[in-house]
């Protein structure tokens, strides 16, 4: 994809900003890249159905509704949980789960970033207070690693929020915070 100028980025890719692809990045409840140890009880509970499935690394996996409830929407009313499960959950390669959880063991270093990259664009990392998939302490550890760079790095924890915070009631608070953060940056709009 050709883009004439760097743009703001949001999403699940570990290395876009590290490679100079973007003028700013927002990592909403970001999975931990290589160097940040993400596993704890809540993460294991949220993903056990995938990690304990035989050969899931090389298979397409499908998250069950109870796994989705616990990992993504644990603070949502059940009718919203069902709506978002039906809307967003699709079969996915098991490889991405293993690469994120066991990044230190990945010989291909799919999630490696240069935390000390001083040329990296500004980065905002967020956490949801009640996120089971990427608990706040993992998100903070991620932030502490990225702060090794002199590039602007900020962190915001949203109180009362689960992992799927952008779909949760009151999502406007998150959107407004991100928009205000972006507007404060000295970014050339191109």
Protein language model regions, located:
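Catalytic active-site module of serine/aspartate enzymes centered on a nucleophile-bearing elbow/loop
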Residues: 149-190
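Glycine-rich nucleophile elbow surrounding the catalytic serine of serine-hydrolase chemistry
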Residues: 4-19
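Active-site nucleophile elbow and catalytic-triad environment of alpha/beta-hydrolase enzymes
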Residues: 93-115
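Conserved alpha/beta-hydrolase catalytic His-Asp/Glu region
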Residues: 62-98
């Amino acid at each position: 994809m050709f883009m004439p100028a760097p743009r703001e980025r949001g999403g699940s890719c570990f290395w876009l900003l590290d490679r100079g692809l973007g003028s700013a990045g927002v990592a909403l409840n970001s999975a931990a890249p290589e160097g940040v140890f993400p596993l704890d009880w809540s993460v294991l509970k949220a993903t056990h159905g995938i990690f304990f499935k035989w050969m899931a690394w090389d298979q397409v996996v499908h998250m069950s509704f109870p796994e989705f409830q616990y990992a993504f929407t644990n603070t949502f009313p059940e009718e919203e949980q069902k709506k978002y499960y039906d809307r967003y959950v699709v079969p996915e390669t098991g490889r991405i789960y293993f690469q994120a959880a066991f990044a230190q063991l990945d010989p291909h270093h799919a999630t490696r970033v240069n935390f000390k990259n001083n040329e990296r664009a500004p980065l905002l990392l967020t956490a949801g207070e009640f996120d089971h998939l990427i608990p706040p302490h993992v998100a903070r550890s991620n932030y502490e690693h990225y702060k090794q760079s002199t590039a602007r790095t900020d962190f915001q924890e949203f109180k009362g929020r689960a992992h799927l915070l952008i779909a949760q009631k009151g999502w406007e608070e998150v959107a407004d915070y991100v928009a205000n953060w972006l507007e404060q940056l000295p970014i050339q709009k191109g």
